[in-house]
Curated annotation (Swiss-Prot):
Protein's recorded name: Nicotinate-nucleotide--dimethylbenzimidazole phosphoribosyltransferase
GO process annotations (BP): cobalamin biosynthetic process
Top-level taxonomy: Bacteria, Pseudomonadati, Pseudomonadota, Betaproteobacteria, Neisseriales
NCBIfam families: cobT_DBIPRT, PRK00105.1
Entry-linked HAMAP family: CobT (MF_00230)
EC number: 2.4.2.21
Catalysed reactions, semicolon-separated: 5,6-dimethylbenzimidazole + nicotinate beta-D-ribonucleotide = alpha-ribazole 5'-phosphate + nicotinate + H(+)
A family per Pfam: DBI_PRT
Molecular function terms, GO-annotated: nicotinate-nucleotide-dimethylbenzimidazole phosphoribosyltransferase activity
InterPro entries reported in the protein's UniProt record: Nict_dMeBzImd_PRibTrfase, Nict_dMeBzImd_PRibTrfase_bact, Nict_dMeBzImd_PRibTrfase_N, Nict_dMeBzImd_PRibTrfase_sf
Task performed by this protein: Catalyzes the synthesis of alpha-ribazole-5'-phosphate from nicotinate mononucleotide (NAMN) and 5,6-dimethylbenzimidazole (DMB).
Keywords, comma-separated and alphabetical: Cobalamin biosynthesis, Glycosyltransferase, Transferase
Domain of life per record: Bacteria
PANTHER family named among the record's database cross-references: NICOTINATE-NUCLEOTIDE--DIMETHYLBENZIMIDAZOLE PHOSPHORIBOSYLTRANSFERASE
UniProt organism field: Chromobacterium violaceum (strain ATCC 12472 / DSM 30191 / JCM 1249 / CCUG 213 / NBRC 12614 / NCIMB 9131 / NCTC 9757 / MK)
């Protein structure tokens, strides 16, 4: 299994020492200061390199949609993958604005997207209905994890030093809610939200599906991998693999919202040291995301009321991180500027 690369604590300490002598009152840049120091630890440099983000969107369908859990039909997954390929989705606009590498990976789209200029790593055409049976077999789960690992390797080989995973899959908030409930012990009423905007009847269907799925595995002693197979989805497993491989290679991941956090929880059961390589981007408007973040011991940078997925919330936060690094590297020290430091 994966083993996360150790942090370079000497580089982090050197970065903190630099922060202490920059021309500003100590701590006056707030979280931006420690963010820069975290990148120092991740990169092994007291003055980290500018950030080169890579965004990978994993797409798959979910059998649980037959339970009436989504406001949109499953065909939307295929249609949105076409939209990604054509550059018309929100994450495409954000990637262009950030000059970020963007890759779309089909790990389980039910429709035919074989002619599109994306990465084709389809494990199967959608997961099974998790309310009635295991969403994936153990072999399918491992194949999806490996698709995510391979995507992380491609991104890093292309020069990325910051990873963002996005998701596309009608029904995936239901799978994510089931995972978060199982892994945290939280009640479905606290975790299951409206996702793509279901009405009250749809919300009741989602809660019923999650409760049925949880009851199906209630007496089983499941490992993290088993839980992912029983209650997850192909793109969720791929995102987990993406995070794990990034950490093994020494590249941090900026975690998006509800689905990405469910994947991170699963990945953390596989490698607890993964925590050191994750950074939460935003607090989603989706019910239960706060519970997932608490379980991950991650603190989001912003709360903009977003709940789109695709990696969009994480992408919006990339400029904050880029500015944190630029401030750290570009500001003068008191000695360099000829400015008097704090009086003894």
């Amino acid at each position: 299994m994966n083993s996360s690369k150790p942090l370079d604590l000497s580089a982090r300490n050197a970065a903190r020492a630099r922060q202490a002598v920059l021309t500003k009152p100590p701590g006056s840049l707030g979280q931006l200061e420690e963010l820069a120091c975290r990148f120092a630890a991740w990169q092994g440099r007291a003055q980290p390199e500018d950030l080169r983000p890579a965004i990978t969107v994993f797409a798959a369908d979910h059998g649980v949609t037959v339970e009436g859990v989504s406001a949109f039909p499953s065909a939307v997954t295929t249609e949105m993958v076409r939209n990604f390929a054509n550059g018309g989705a929100a994450i495409c606009v954000l990637a262009r604005a950030l000059d970020a590498r963007l890759e779309v990976v089909d790990v389980g789209v039910a429709g035919d997207v074989s002619a599109l200029p994306i990465v084709h790593a389809k494990v199967r055409p959608g997961s099974h209905n998790l309310a009635r049976q295991a969403a994936m077999s153990a072999e399918e789960t491992e194949a999806a994890l490996e698709a995510g690992r391979a995507a992380a390797r491609r991104a890093v080989e292309a020069g990325a030093n910051l990873l963002v995973a996005g998701d596309m899959g009608i029904g995936n908030t239901t799978a994510s809610a089931a995972l978060i409930c199982r892994l945290t012990g939280a009640a479905p009423e606290l975790v299951v939200g409206r996702g793509t905007g279901v009405d009250d009847a749809g919300l009741a269907n989602k809660r019923r599906a999650v409760k049925t799925a949880l009851a199906r595995v209630a007496w089983e002693n499941l490992s993290g991998l088993d839980t992912l197979s029983e209650l997850g989805g192909l793109e969720i497993a791929a995102i987990a693999g993406f995070y794990l491989e990034g950490a093994r290679l020494g590249v941090p991941s900026l975690v998006d919202g509800f689905i990405a956090s469910a994947a991170a929880l699963c990945a953390k059961t596989i490698d607890p040291s993964l925590h050191d390589w994750l950074l939460a981007s935003h607090r989603s408007a989706e019910s239960g995301h706060e519970l997932a973040l608490t379980a991950l011991q991650l603190h989001p940078l912003v709360d903009l009321g977003m709940r789109l997925g695709e990696g969009s919330g994480a992408a919006v936060c990339v400029p904050l991180l880029q500015l944190a690094v630029k401030l750290h590297n570009g500001m003068a020290t008191f000695d360099e500027a000829g400015v008097s430091g704090k009086s003894a």
